[in-house]
Amino acid sequence: KVTRKGGGSALPWKTELFRGIVRSAVTEASRKGVPVTVKMRVGIDAEHITYLEAGRIAEAEGVAAVALHGRTASQAYSGQADWSAIARLKEAVTSIPVLGNGDIWSAEDALEMVRQTGCDGVVVGRGCLGRPWLFADLAAAFAGSEVRVRPGLREVTATLRRHTEYLVDFYDGDEQRACRDIRKHIAWYLKGFPAGSTVRHQLALVDSLQALDDLIGTMDLDVPWPGDAAEGQRGRAGSPRVVALPENWLR
């Protein structure tokens, strides 16, 4: 829906349009002292790579930082992110921070990305789904600490409950809407925990805070962190695809 209209990863292909948008955003935001950052992918597909030129344009137009996800739009989240592209962007863009993104599932992944690419920091996406404590792990890792957060099921479900409460507030008290929203996060929160298929199915249909509380109450909350079973990829990987673009966009 985004690239079909020339947005997202399609936009940097039109370099002057991209330049104009970045310039306008930086100019207007600077009036209020707001920094502008640009996050992008490697390109549209393997034949239409845009990130190096887009990074240089963004740098020249005064953005505060650039972030790169090491996949093309056509890859979606399939395969592995190409961290070497982040390294090449870091070599090309020298006056502002370059942030890396893609396949950061743990603090150790973040440290390894920085080691391999020389990037100035990382951006986390799918890795924090159902796992907001990942940011505490990242902060500890970059501070040189080996301490990692490993919550048991009691703490995880309490975090899930609090997340749902925040959604209720966000939706102005609409519990049903909030619960519909939280459903997609439940499997990520419970990844690796022995919650049972029946409870998981019922949680996927939850429609109120009370229903959520009742189902959490049926679980053995003394279960500790499940270790490797809770680690690894989160979210859908998807499959490579043809990117929808406006007519004649690549000419």
Predicted regions and their residues:
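N-terminal small/glycine-rich loop or linker at the start of catalytic domains
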Residues: 1-8, 25, 29-42
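Glycine-rich, proline-tolerant flexible connector loops at the mouths of alpha/beta enzymes
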Residues: 1-13, 68-78
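A short, structure-level motif marking secondary-structure boundaries and short turns
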Residues: 7, 38-40, 70-72, 95-96, ...
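Active-site mouth loops of central-metabolism enzymes
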Residues: 10-13, 37-51
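Alpha/beta catalytic cores of nucleotide-metabolism and tRNA/nucleoside-modifying enzymes
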Residues: 16, 20-23, 27, 31-35, ...
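Active-site beta-loop-alpha junctions enriched in small/polar residues
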Residues: 39-45, 69-73, 103-105, 127
